[in-house]
C-alpha cells in the first residue's frame, strides 16, 4: 500500500457560547479546523482533525501540505517510524513541530487500523476493554485557584477523574 495524496479540508465552524468562562477568555466564536485525509492506492483513507477546537489550525495547514506531504508521497503508510526518525531533521531545518506532525501520525494510525480491520488500541497491544470517563479541557486558567475551582465544579458534575492541562505559570504555583 502506498500513499497517493494528502489533503486538508478546511472547516469553519461556530463555537456556541456555553457559558464557560476562564482566565484565558470565553469559549465561543468562529474557528477553522482542518480534516486531514491521507489517501492510499488501496482505497483506504486515514483521517484526523487538525488544530485546537478554540484556536483553530490554520497555522498548521501549510507545513503539513508543503513539508510533510512531500516526505510521505509514495511511501508505505506503515513507515511511521521512518518519519519519526526524520523529525529531527524536519524540525531543525524545516521548522516542523510536534503539533504539525501529530495529526499526520494519528491519520497514519487510522490507516493502519483500517488496513488491519482492527481498533488502534489492539494494534498497540492494549488488553483493557473499558475505562472510566474523565474530564479535560485545553488550559483555561493561569492560577492554581482557577484549577482548584474547575476541579470542584467537575467533581460536582459527577466526574471522578480530571486530566489537568496547565500553563508553565500555573505549574510554578
Predicted regions and their residues:
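Alpha/beta enzyme core
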Residues: 148-160
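Conserved small/polar residues in nucleotide/adenosyl-binding loops
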Residues: 166-171
Amino acid at each position: 500500500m502506498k500513499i497517493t495524496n494528502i489533503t486538508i479540508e478546511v472547516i469553519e465552524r461556530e463555537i456556541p457560547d456555553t457559558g464557560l468562562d476562564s482566565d484565558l477568555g470565553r469559549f465561543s466564536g468562529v474557528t477553522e479546523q482542518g480534516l486531514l485525509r491521507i489517501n492510499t492506492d488501496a482505497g483506504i483513507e486515514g483521517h484526523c482533525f487538525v488544530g485546537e477546537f478554540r484556536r483553530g489550525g490554520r497555522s498548521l495547514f501549510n507545513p503539513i501540505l508543503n513539508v510533510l506531504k512531500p516526505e510521505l508521497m509514495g511511501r508505505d503508510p506503515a513507515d511511521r517510524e521512518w518519519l519519526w526518525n526524520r523529525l529531527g531533521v524536519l524540525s531543525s531545518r524545516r521548522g516542523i513541530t510536534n503539533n504539525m506532525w501529530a495529526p499526520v501520525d494519528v491519520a497514519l494510525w487510522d490507516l493502519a487500523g483500517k488496513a488491519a480491520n482492527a481498533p488502534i488500541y489492539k494494534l498497540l497491544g492494549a488488553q483493557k476493554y473499558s475505562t472510566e470517563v474523565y474530564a479535560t479541557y485545553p488550559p483555561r486558567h493561569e492560577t492554581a485557584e482557577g484549577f482548584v475551582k474547575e476541579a470542584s465544579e467537575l467533581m460536582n458534575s459527577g466526574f471522578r477523574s480530571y486530566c489537568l492541562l496547565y500553563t508553565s505559570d500555573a505549574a510554578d504555583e
